[in-house]
């Protein structure tokens, strides 16, 4: 199988989403797997903090450090030069505030050559998302089941099962959209094709299954 001829650009990605075309993102942590994905039609790779559980054998993602994300993202970038690479921002690399978030995002982009970053959280991290985007770094939001706050959520449980929880997710998505987030990763929620979500054509949704 031949490699992709070129990497999808951020403007091309936005155009595809605006036209309703699907985009595929696969989670990868190392050079060999990145090489395989680069030879596939998949447009994006996520270097997730889940590497703590999948690669390191940890019980949670929170111990993963910014340096470890950078290390793995750098390896993935070498293996997938023609695929858009997303670097996950690990626990406590952005929670302090917008300036810390910008510094962490900048390190991921500068030191690993990733194309954009992903952040967990909704309206509470929207100011940090806006700060990073203003600096020229694309950001993907992540709401629903967020592993970094799983303890506060009562464990790895489906979110948005009640009308109140669903409304909170919609508010989170709106806040990220207003902060100019590239798209939103909606993980493990209790509703599918919710009319409130599907009617918001300006929202960039990416459904990720557990």
Predicted regions and their residues:
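Alpha/beta enzyme core
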Residues: 2-209
């Amino acid at each position: 199988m031949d490699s992709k001829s070129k990497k999808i650009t951020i403007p091309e990605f936005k155009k595809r989403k605006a036209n309703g075309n699907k985009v595929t993102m696969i989670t990868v942590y190392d050079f060999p797997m990145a090489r395989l994905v680069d030879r596939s039609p998949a447009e994006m790779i996520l270097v997730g903090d889940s590497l703590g559980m999948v690669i390191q054998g940890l019980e949670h993602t929170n111990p993963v450090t910014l340096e470890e994300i950078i290390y793995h993202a750098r390896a993935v970038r070498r293996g997938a030069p023609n695929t858009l690479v997303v670097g996950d921002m690990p626990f406590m690399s952005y929670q302090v505030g917008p300036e810390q978030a910008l510094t962490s995002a900048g390190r991921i982009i500068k030191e690993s050559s990733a194309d954009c970053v992903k952040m967990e959280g909704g309206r509470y991290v929207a100011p940090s998302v806006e700060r990073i985007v203003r600096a020229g770094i694309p950001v993907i939001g992540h709401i629903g089941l967020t592993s970094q706050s799983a303890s506060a959520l009562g464990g790895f449980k489906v979110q948005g099962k009640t009308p109140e929880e669903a409304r909170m997710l919609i508010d989170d998505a709106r806040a990220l959209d207003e902060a100019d987030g590239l798209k939103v990763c909606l993980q493990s929620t209790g509703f599918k094709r919710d009319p409130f979500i599907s009617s918001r054509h300006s929202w960039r949704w990416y459904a990720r299954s557990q």
